[in-house]
Amino acid sequence: MTICSVLIRMRFLKIKIFLLTQLIFTSFYSQNYSYKIGLLKYNGGGDWYANPTALSNLIEFCNSEIGTNINPVYDEVEVGDNIIFNYPYIHLTGHGNVVFDANEVSNLKNYLLAGGFLHISDNYGLDPFIRKEMKKIFPELDFIVLPFDHPIYHQKFDFNEGLPKIHQHDEKPSLGLGLIYNGRLVCFYDYECDLGDGWEDADVHNDSEEARIKALEMGANILSFTFLGKKN
């Protein structure tokens, strides 16, 4: 074997070692997140996929502003899939119909009873459908208006008057509603608020910078409340 061929082999070996090292580092780094969150994919014809840039922007804001370590890539999760138990926070949004079948009702209820948290964001038009479906899960519970001193409004950011108003639709006030099971807030529902629209890229809805920041700060509070697990 010539010296030249030996040098070539050594060069290729160094390249392979370098690439393997990079692969191992990348694999380790990609798994070095504290949390991953999910977007709930439901049946019924409603646009569960509305606001496609919202969660990514919220994650970026939270990691930057409140020191979370959330994986920047969120997952789309079907209601009846047991993988839902891997996510401390699940987001549900849309404008239209939502339908949960018996298996999905059971799975989502078990998820919430096991410590999971569901955040519903009314993207205008969702309300009559989601209320009916949540009654399948907790027939004994009604959504209640959370008081302004609830911890969800007072994490890093204080919202002394409750939810900010991001979009105006029916001249109704924005409401922060909750389902409380055995003393724990298992579901937060922002109604007539459009938080998710406020999380979207600035050029999507042309919201003011002030409105977008308020929406992101409230979203950060919701995630902080979810992760810290404060009692009501």
Where are these regions (language model features)?
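Loop/turn elements at helix/coil->beta-strand transitions in domains of secreted/extracellular proteins
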Residues: 33-35, 85-90, 113-117, 141, ...
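Short alpha-beta junction capping motif
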Residues: 37, 89-128
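Surface-exposed patches in mature extracellular/periplasmic domains of secreted proteins
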Residues: 69-77, 120-123, 141-147, 232
